[in-house]
Amino acid sequence: MEYFDIRKMPVNLWRNGAGETREICCFPPATRDFHWRASIASIAGNGEFSLFPGVERVITLLEGGEVMLEGVNAFTHTLKRHQPFTFAGDSVVKATLSEGQMSMDLNIMTRRDRCKAKVRVADRTFTTFGSRGGVVFVISGAWQLGDKLLTADQGACWHDGKHTLRLLKPEGQLLFSEITWLPGYTPDTVQ
């Protein structure tokens, strides 16, 4: 289990200058050839996303104005706060900020032939499945995960194991991304 606070994470600038990324976790760790990866991105200007052949991307707007995504296959989609959207990482996708407002997004990327991600908003206590990886990012409220208290802009990631996230206040929300391995793959077989 790894815990994070985005206010304390290192920032990497994008090559095109239109944003920056804070990597939450990568599996296997410390490799460019990841099976799955989670990050927080800040989009500061209009431009194309980097290509990731063979990768599915799930992007969720956390803060800022809406973002219009346009793909070369004639799809358009407007990112709205806390509503995950999935698209192919090997497609050219351009992001246009509404009214020029910077946005902050949670990004989950999975190698299409190894695993998949499902991202959803949780607003009550829940327990994860034991054989799946996951990432949580607290939007609001106070949450207990093991012996750790998590509040806004904090979270955790894991590669497997059963974990209970307990909401400690009457209201709160977090984003939960569950990573499911495809048949024939497990965290032990892909390292």
Curated annotation (Swiss-Prot):
SUPFAM superfamilies: RmlC-like cupins. InterPro entries: RmlC-like_jellyroll (IPR014710), RmlC_Cupin_sf (IPR011051), Uncharacterised_HutD/Ves (IPR010282), Uncharacterised_Ves (IPR023482). It comes from the Bacteria. Signal peptide: none annotated. PANTHER family: PROTEIN VES. Belongs to the Ves family. HAMAP family: Ves. This is Protein Ves.
